[in-house]
Amino acid sequence: MDIISKSGEGNKYTINSAIAFVAYASHIDINTTEFSKVLSGLRDFINDEAIRLGGKISDGSFNKCNGDWYEWLIGIRAIEFFLESETNFIVVKMPNATSFDVMSIYKSCLSEFIYDLRSKLSLNNVNLITSNPDFSIIDIRGRREELKSMLKDISFSNISLSTISEIDNLYKNFIDYAELEHIKSFLSVKTTFRPDRRLQLAHEGSLMKALYTHLQTRTWTINPTGIRYYAAATSIGNADVIGLKTVATHSITDVKSLPQSAVDEIFKINSVLDVDSCLSHILSS
């Protein structure tokens, strides 16, 4: 299978992101390589193939694939972490919002409240437009052994297209699954925190918390555990720390509630060890 394919006329090629990822992973030890170096190595690997074929790859193609590759790196290690530990939580990669609504993870009796909210807002010419966090951290008490058996072959030492498919489709096992407290938190990841990405994350975190509060209100849940929203990138600067402390807007509309940050914490995830450290902290919070 080819890691790149010709795109129309001329010398432009597109990246077959999963095939390229699997092919490159067979040449390196991801367990000991910084993720930023994996991404730059993939770029060189693909560009070398494009040059060999007399073609070129656009920066836009790499930008799209970088996000996929970074999520697969984190997603695969997160499953390894689950298999190696005794945790009752699993980190599930979410698809794009255009193909799946993250609220569908909740049981239908809960998600229907969100659909009802959307419908009522639309009557007032207002749209509830949400993006999906990249990962949901879900309580799987009672299903641990089933999931361990299902996911036992996922490993950096054995990456295949089947591995990628399992990571990408794991969410299907959790549709109509969660009670209000079963989703512990969300994690969204970017290779880098550009200013526009910081705004996107703050908006997403604020909205996820507002929707949780809406469900809490509709179900009359007293003293809920709440939901947390985290962000991560291969590197973090002071501007990122400050920018992602933006307030969750729903928390300043009621004087009886304490202000909340849209993003609870940010993490540097640039290696397997960073993934482990991040997940250990999130699961103990």
UniProtKB/Swiss-Prot annotation:
GO molecular function, a single term: metal ion binding
Alphabetized UniProt keyword annotations: Endonuclease, Hydrolase, Magnesium, Metal-binding, Nuclease, Restriction system
UniProt superkingdom: Bacteria
GO terms for biological process, alphabetical: DNA restriction-modification system
InterPro entries cross-referenced by the UniProt entry: Restrct_endonuc-II-like (IPR011335), Restrct_endonuc_II_Cfr10I (IPR012415)
Enzyme Commission number, as recorded: 3.1.21.4
Annotated CDD domains: Bse634I-like
Record: residues binding Mg(2+) 1: 134, 204
Catalytic activity: Endonucleolytic cleavage of DNA to give specific double-stranded fragments with terminal 5'-phosphates
Named cofactor requirement(s): Mg(2+)
One Pfam family linked to the record: Bse634I
Cofactor comment: Binds 2 magnesium ions per subunit.
Residue sites binding Mg(2+) 2 per the record: 134
Subunit architecture: Homodimer.
UniProt protein name: Type II restriction enzyme Cfr10I
